[in-house]
Amino acid sequence: MILAFVETLAKIHQLDWRAQGLSFLLRRAVGPNLIGREINWYWDGLSWAGEIDAQKRFSGVRDWLLANEPEVPRPVLCHGDANFTNYLFKDNLVSAVLDWEMAFIGAPEADLAYALIGMSSLSSDYPPGTPSDDEMKAAYEAASGATLQHWEYYSVFALYRIVLTHILGLRAFPEDFQAAFQSHVEGLIARLNAAWSAAK
């Protein structure tokens, strides 16, 4: 099932998004480049929500992401929320893909990094035989015919997106649940800082 998930992600990235009328996804936020616009889209979310403390806390990683943005030689349709839980399965094959509100035009590595980090944040206790990250990356390359590049950068970018969406979502939870959820968020922030330190 997990490899079918990765292979479906590769198929999404092969869609002709221009022919499908999806060019409007290029205009989600202001910025000269594809990934920079996405960085700013999540940052704008913090501004709209009045999350000033969060902006102070993450301004360094945002500045680094903007300054080190790789070129995207093959812009693709990114699902955006490429989380295993957003994929429905029948007979071990993907039958539907849900939750497209975070879709954007960007680098395929952004989607795959988000998917792998999202899976590892859901659980560290997968059954025997579950493909490793390296096996899933190899499966993606085999399905897409593309070579993954700038993996450290896109891992930081994925964690930046995950952390900021969690911060924005925190206020939607009941107060008695927020403390437990905050602990989960702090764990993600620690992963973000570690990935950023390793990539610098």
Where are these regions (language model features)?
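Glycine-rich, phosphate-binding/catalytic loops in enzymes
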Residues: 29-30, 96, 113-115
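Start-of-helix signal in alpha-solenoid helical-repeat scaffolds, especially tetratricopeptide repeats
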Residues: 153-156
